[in-house]
Amino acid sequence: MKLKGFLRRWRPANAQHQLFLAIAGAVFLATLLASPCARAQQAVAPPPSDREVIAELLKRVQLLETRVKELEAERAQGAGPAKPIKAAPIAEIPTRTAPQEENEMAMRDTGPNLRIRGFTDVTLHGSNQKGSTTSFSLGQMNLFITSDVSEKFKFLSEIVFEAGDDNAIGVDVERLLLQYSHNDYFSLAIGRYHTAIGYYNTAYHHSTWFQTAVGRPFLFQFEDNGGILPIHNVGASASGRIPSGALGLHYVVEVGNGRTSRLPLSEAVQNVVDENNHKAVNLALFARPGVLPGLQTGFSVYRDVLAPDNSPRIGQTILAAHAVYVRPSFEWLNEALVIRHAPRGQTRVFHTPGFYTQISRRFGSYRPYFRYQYVNAAADEPIFSDVGLRHGPSVGLRFEASEAVAFKLQYDHTNLRQRPAIDALTLQFAFTF
């Protein structure tokens, strides 16, 4: 009982003392077990008392404690202050990279995500036009790029790889826009955009795969293909809904550099420098009645001042109107416009009218279509002297080979002023990727 009380009062200071206490206990038990044998062998010696045994054990424990202290002192003098044990490299990796991984995941969740979709086509075409040859041609390869910059801001771009008549392939940034969407009634886009003249120019961009026919109507041909409209513009475009109930009114207001005076320049779109200080302005209004889904009617007014070399400045006004009805299995497009050129200092005003109509109906994977187009520019028109009169029908068939591939076969007959009519046949393979 005395031993138990003593052991309860004496508490080791550290783990090493506990170890030596266990050793002392083992010695004590061994002594108790061996004492009968010793008494039997040495009957003449009196047996030791319990107090003497305890005193002997305490003496040994004290000796062991003293030795441990000496060893600890020698170790401290030889190695200096004790250093914390470093974690193994494998344990340090998660601690070191966890914040980086969290930041990267946060950027993936909240930062801009770039999305790219591609469109292109390959055509085989031939005609009876003098000087032309039957050829395979690479169409525009369009990389349509979008990104959600933030909740309100978005990025949109069309990067086009295109071969010219010299067989060289060039790269053009056809659209590049930073778009801000405040609500359904106001959105603002800044950069290079497709001018909201009529319907076709903002409904179909740089991809023949979206279009029913092989190509765009002549009125809406791109500038570098001989088009007469300012298809592209660099500036700002605001758009949105107009509170009008079931009438579904929308507006577009645009201000930009406009296009050059259709001279043989390397670039018709004024991407960096405007040829004059006057800015082109375009106002458009259209309706999408809720009672008849697919119907859209509207008009637009475009105003600019052209500055051709060695000629007086020319005021340009473009009035356009459209009525279209587009459903998944049926399409009917109708657009008409007139381009007014008024040279300063002259009393004569030049008007160039044009229109097209296109209708198609889908039957399963097949969609036959018909288009008729017309444009008539005066021979002495100051800007469109090379356009003249051209009109005629186009008949074609589009076959949906898959959800991403379409085959088109189209025949065109074009009548020209004081020149032979042109008959052409085109086979096109258009696809998206």
Stretch-by-stretch model annotation:
Residues 227, 274, 348:
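Glycine- and other small-residue-rich loops at beta-strand/loop junctions that grip anionic moieties
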Residues 269-278, 314:
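Interfacial loop-to-helix transition and helix-capping segments at the boundaries
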Residues 254, 258-272, 304-308:
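Active-site-proximal beta-alpha loop/turn segments in soluble metabolic enzymes
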Residues 21-34:
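Bacterial N-terminal signal peptides
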Residues 130, 168, 176-181, 189-192, ...:
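Outer-membrane beta-barrel pore domains
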Residues 1-20:
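N-terminal secretory signal peptides that target proteins for export/translocation
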Residues 37-125:
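N-terminal periplasmic/intermembrane-space "pro-region" immediately following the signal or transit peptide
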Residues 102-261, 277-282, 286-293, 358-369, ...:
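Outer membrane beta-barrel
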